[in-house]
């Protein structure tokens, strides 16, 4: 088991990474849960694999649990209300500690619950998907959707610890596993060209799961840690982590969170960002084609057959990065270089949306 620290300046917490951590979770978290009431928040697709063994291990603790339906639609104010209701019905006080066991939805929702219930209770992240392990379990962002608006309600709230059991990836469906590469490619575009070359050279092995992703996870975590350390509250530099997300959130919202997994939407958002950058002559054609072809290798089956341009643009206007009613875009401009743009004409944005409407722009 690897034990390391996530150092975000004002906040530091331990990260434990290895295989079969859930087999000994009761021992590993013993110091964190002493004197606490444990509230396990998980999802049905995860509970069916790991729920009963965990219940058995934690039964000696003061212990409650809640299972939500898997999927982005559960990241709602209704689900949030159900969890708060259960916490109050259980008469759980500020000595509660929430264990968020699951993917990105559980991490975002569990973090939001922990940060708001009684003005804050302790939180432990136990991410079980590749996307949650490389990205959403680190950095302190929490959130739920409101209507069709992605992450409209949220807080910044850090866990006491993160436990990454890499063996949970063995039960992860192939589609969810591959979806995480949208975020991994994003990190390569932001600051690690060698990572992109590795993803390109070994794409078949990654897709077949015959090549370890352990190093990828650590690289993404360290890159995010370094960025968040400089801008925890997302007011400047941290915005580069939203590369591909302006479009992605618009796509997810306009399809009612039903058609695309988040990582898939991010991958398509990277295509959009690269295409928009090319139209504005910010990025070289050769690098643009490399980016698109790399994404195509991982997401060739995730075409956009019908694109609600108006709906996506409307959703993008609600993006949290926007200021003065202008849509903010993070665009790739060169290897390991992305920039923030705030004054792109909406007509150019709509043209780029139309150009990617029927798939990937690759030679």
From Swiss-Prot:
Keyword Lyase: yes
SUPFAM superfamilies from the UniProt entry: Dehydroquinate synthase-like
Cofactor note as given: Binds 1 divalent metal cation per subunit. Can use either Co(2+) or Zn(2+).
Superkingdom per UniProt: Bacteria
Database matches in Pfam families: DHQ_synthase, DHQS_C
Molecular function terms from GO: 3-dehydroquinate synthase activity; metal ion binding; nucleotide binding
Name of the top EC class for this enzyme: lyase
Binding site for Zn(2+): 183, 245, 262
Residues that hold NAD(+) according to the record: 70-75, 104-108, 128-129, 141, 150, 168-171
EC number from the UniProt entry: 4.2.3.4
Keywords, alphabetical: Amino-acid biosynthesis, Aromatic amino acid biosynthesis, Cobalt, Cytoplasm, Lyase, Metal-binding, NAD, Nucleotide-binding, Zinc
Protein family according to the UniProt entry: Belongs to the sugar phosphate cyclases superfamily. Dehydroquinate synthase family.
Chain's role: Catalyzes the conversion of 3-deoxy-D-arabino-heptulosonate 7-phosphate (DAHP) to dehydroquinate (DHQ).
NCBIfam families in the record: aroB
Identification of the protein by name: 3-dehydroquinate synthase
Organism: Alkaliphilus oremlandii (strain OhILAs)
Taxonomic lineage: Bacteria, Bacillati, Bacillota, Clostridia, Peptostreptococcales
